[in-house]
From Swiss-Prot:
GO terms for cellular component: mitochondrial inner membrane; mitochondrion; protein-containing complex. SUPFAM superfamilies: Ctag/Cox11 (SSF110111). It is a single-pass membrane protein. Keywords: Copper, Disease variant, Membrane, Mitochondrion, Mitochondrion inner membrane, Primary mitochondrial disease, Transit peptide, Transmembrane, Transmembrane helix. GO terms for biological process: ATP biosynthetic process; intracellular monoatomic cation homeostasis. The chain crosses the membrane at residues 96-114. It comes from Homo sapiens (Human). Residues 115-276 are mitochondrial intermembrane. Residues 64-92 are annotated as: Disordered. This is Cytochrome c oxidase assembly protein COX11, mitochondrial. GO terms for molecular function: copper ion binding; electron transfer activity.
Amino acid sequence: MGGLWRPGWRCVPFCGWRWIHPGSPTRAAERVEPFLRPEWSGTGGAERGLRWLGTWKRCSLRARHPALQPPRRPKSSNPFTRAQEEERRRQNKTTLTYVAAVAVGMLGASYAAVPLYRLYCQTTGLGGSAVAGHASDKIENMVPVKDRIIKISFNADVHASLQWNFRPQQTEIYVVPGETALAFYRAKNPTDKPVIGISTYNIVPFEAGQYFNKIQCFCFEEQRLNPQEEVDMPVFFYIDPEFAEDPRMIKVDLITLSYTFFEAKEGHKLPVPGYN
């Protein structure tokens, strides 16, 4: 340090230690001048400055004092630039509005999914679901097709979230188009608390769903079972006589009716329909 020092020079802690000659002040020295301690001038100034700082390092004066910071870029006064910024803000607000609307729509659709699915499937017979077309006058006037025997197989499944015992009371029955049939499923709640379940159904083959008409069933309805309670749930149905006239059904001799029970969140409690 002594070899670098000259009489009248001072050690300036600005972006690394520098020796500033008083006769040739630089802009950096002038800007740092208000921060120099009086005792740093003279022969021992550099040594005392280093002892006070502790080590050689980059200065942080520019970050600590506004006088040493570069001038801020003023906001653009260009009308075109301002228009671009306003357009960008407007587009961002529009995007947020669309995202919020989609989120609300998806939430509403999730609540309406089961009723809409039930209405659609029962009306069209698509998705392998039965058709709700069983007017009493039609049932009374149906003519059974005796030479067309169909085997109806029954299947039962329970979702992993529902701790129920669920099974068909019969594995299969034989019917003919144009006559009604009655089958039963049995469900039991083996737990020590009330549980509410809800079921969906499916029919295989897919094309036979439009001819499989349910007069009474327990699908899409909440079923509440108390601890250890067991119930028999009926399925009253018939195969439309037009089944025998459809060329696609010529080789169809087996129809499978399958139910799957899921656990339902408790909303309004519905009684078990028609089990008395």
